[in-house]
């Protein structure tokens, strides 16, 4: 049975982790960062400590401190703070999940272990169930990013297995170019939120019914992507295509600079 409650939709910025010149996390600028996203980019949802936030390269302590600051400063200004809690070890993931719940996060998400990988889909479901159980009151989203994890199971098949096994399961952050798999998820599992994570081809995912999108570029291209969403929803596909193409031209330059460092420089 799907987790009941509010649905995630629209643009969700995958936040960068601010750093000092000494490579320490810079908590002092997070309030300003939140205000910038809300006031300048019209973003009201964030995904923290994920790939863009370099969460897998941070210590557990650093991730907890970041979660606390993001939740504190987003309260009353944003609609949702989704905290990525995935780690290479199950106990750390559960620790972060419980901590996110205690801080007042709105949802959690997790990639699966990518060093010693789940042997099959059933093993992956058991892992996700264990992580989600540490924060049973929070909606849980699986973070699918096969380019980095090497986990290439079809998400369409995964959703069929989690449906009756993880009560708090709410959907998937789908960061892959396989639009056939994505489309099947959207059409067959309407109770779940299917959030697309490849910014440069968002329009294609919208055509297949994406409920929302999570991405790094919404930190600085939130308004432009918002315009594209509005054009698409209004049925003005020509305008939506024009905006998507202009975004792609810009992102081609940004990604050529080295994806995350280039984006962070913006």
Swiss-Prot record:
Protein name: N-acetylneuraminate lyase B
Gene name of the record: npl-b
Residues engaged in binding aceneuramate: 51-52, 175, 197, 199-200, 216
Keyword match rRNA processing: no
UniProt xrefs under SUPFAM superfamilies: Aldolase
Keyword vocabulary terms for this entry: Carbohydrate metabolism, Cytoplasm, Lyase, Schiff base
Pfam families: DHDPS
Catalytic residues identified in the record: 143 (proton donor), 173 (schiff-base intermediate with substrate)
Gene Ontology cellular-component annotations: cytoplasm
Major subcellular location class: cytoplasm
Complex and partners: Homotetramer.
EC number of this enzyme: 4.1.3.3
InterPro entries with a match to the protein in the record: Aldolase_TIM, DapA-like
Subcellular location(s) of the protein: Cytoplasm
Reaction(s) the record says it catalyses: aceneuramate = aldehydo-N-acetyl-D-mannosamine + pyruvate
Organism: Xenopus laevis
Purpose: Catalyzes the cleavage of N-acetylneuraminic acid (sialic acid) to form pyruvate and N-acetylmannosamine via a Schiff base intermediate. It prevents sialic acids from being recycled and returning to the cell surface. Involved in the N-glycolylneuraminic acid (Neu5Gc) degradation pathway.
Swiss-Prot/TrEMBL GO biological process terms: N-acetylneuraminate catabolic process
GO function terms (MF aspect): N-acetylneuraminate lyase activity
This protein's pathway: Amino-sugar metabolism; N-acetylneuraminate degradation
Family: Belongs to the DapA family. NanA subfamily.
């Amino acid at each position: 049975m799907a987790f009941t409650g509010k649905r995630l939709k629209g643009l969700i910025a995958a936040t960068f982790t601010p750093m000092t010149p000494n490579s320490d996390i810079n908590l002092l600028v997070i309030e300003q960062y939140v205000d910038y996203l809300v006031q300048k980019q019209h973003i009201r949802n964030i995904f923290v400590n994920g790939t863009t936030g370099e969460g897998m390269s941070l210590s557990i302590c650093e991730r907890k401190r970041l979660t606390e600051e993001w939740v504190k400063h987003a309260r009353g200004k944003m609609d949702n703070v989704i905290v990525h809690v995935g780690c290479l070890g199950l106990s750390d993931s559960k620790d972060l999940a419980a901590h996110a719940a205690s801080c007042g996060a709105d949802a959690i998400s997790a990639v699966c272990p990518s060093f010693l990988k789940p042997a099959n889909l059933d093993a992956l479901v058991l892992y996700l169930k264990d992580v989600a159980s540490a924060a049973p009151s929070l909606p849980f989203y699986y973070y699918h990013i096969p380019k980095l994890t090497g986990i290439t199971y079809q998400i369409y098949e995964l959703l069929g297995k989690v449906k009756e096994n993880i009560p708090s399961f709410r959907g998937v952050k789908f960061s892959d170019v396989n639009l056939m798999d994505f489309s099947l998820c959207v059409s067959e599992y309407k109770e779940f939120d299917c959030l697309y994570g490849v910014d440069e081809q968002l329009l294609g995912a919208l055509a297949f019914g994406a409920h929302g999108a999570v991405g790094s570029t919404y930190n600085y291209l939130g308004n432009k992507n918002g315009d594209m969403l509005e054009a698409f929803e209004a049925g003005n596909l020509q305008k939506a295509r024009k905006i998507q193409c202009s975004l792609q031209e810009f992102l081609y330059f940004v990604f050529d600079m080295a994806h995350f460092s280039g984006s962070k420089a913006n």
